[in-house]
Amino acid sequence: MSGPSVNTTVTRARGFAEPVSPDGFGPRPRPTIRNVAERAGVSKSLVSLVLRGSPHVSEHRRQAVLQAARELGYRPNAVARSLVEGRTHLVGALVADLHNPFYAEFLDGLQESLHGDGLRLLIGNSQWDPAFEDEAVEAFLELRVDGLVLLGIAPTSETLIEATGYTPTVVVGERDIDLGGVDIVVDDDQLGARLAIDHLVELGHRRIAHIEGTRSSSGRFRCEGYLVAMRRHALAPYIMVEQGDCTEEGGMLAARSLLTRDPRPTAIFAANDAVAIGVLAAAAELGLRVPEDLSVIGYDNTHLAGAQPISLTTVDQPRRAMGRSAATLLSDRIGDPGKTSRLRQVTPELVVRRSTGPAQG
């Protein structure tokens, strides 16, 4: 039995005609350098010079070639050009979780700077799945990317380690890396955690819990910062750590566990803003008012943190600045692969909003 038929309709925007072949059926063949040369009345080699941006072409001939290319709808063959130049001007960015606003906002800064350096960005989403990570990196390598950015992902698999050995790579948010020629961009996560706990202690809180993000070294460093700060304030007996998974749902589940204890915490420091929003949801579900009954602090200062009615107190790590820093490191390493590995650490700041207040009892 034959399968169901599928009808496909293609709609073109007004003012743009679908190129068709001379017989009227299907798209016409793609124009070639030869077609551009014939239309402009120049040689194929001169067309190649113009398309490569060579300065050794008169302005008159350059404009003639560009005009012919526009009229024909010619697009240079990126694969062929990369074989000639030895570069594709492509960068592959592999992201642990595109649902996390921090990663999306980081990519804004990364793409902005890469574009200024003449590089184009390809993005893959691993969804925290090691198999997806390997597949995405292999796809990037098949496209002969000039460089890799691993965001929230440590190169631990054989595929990723091998890739970093011959492809310029920058890792963001992971510190536990001992690979030559790999640059790192991180936030001072321990300092950020201490800022959060100091703020809560100043408000009179003692029973301060932490929901730990378990999927990255950043999460571990934030937890260590929490532990150090609690002990420094002589609050070790009140330490409470609940495991989370860096999502709103994970924050809700962890918060339910914490907030049904007796005595319950009066404040929660969450691994990131997404987890903190899950905490807010759990508090509302249990009839707790924020900040009157419970203070909540997130981490990242994503755009969601400042939205109403959330108004989340959070630790700001400059996401776009981190993206720009990663782009600079990568561009430098593409130009000089033999550079010594470098680490760029940004300094976080506490942003106080309405989700924190004085401890009640």
Map each language-model feature to its residues.
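Amphipathic helical "hinge" segments at domain boundaries
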Residues: 59, 72-139, 143-147, 227
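Short beta->alpha connector loops
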Residues: 127-130, 151-156, 274
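Catalytic-core regions built around general acid/base machinery
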Residues: 158-166
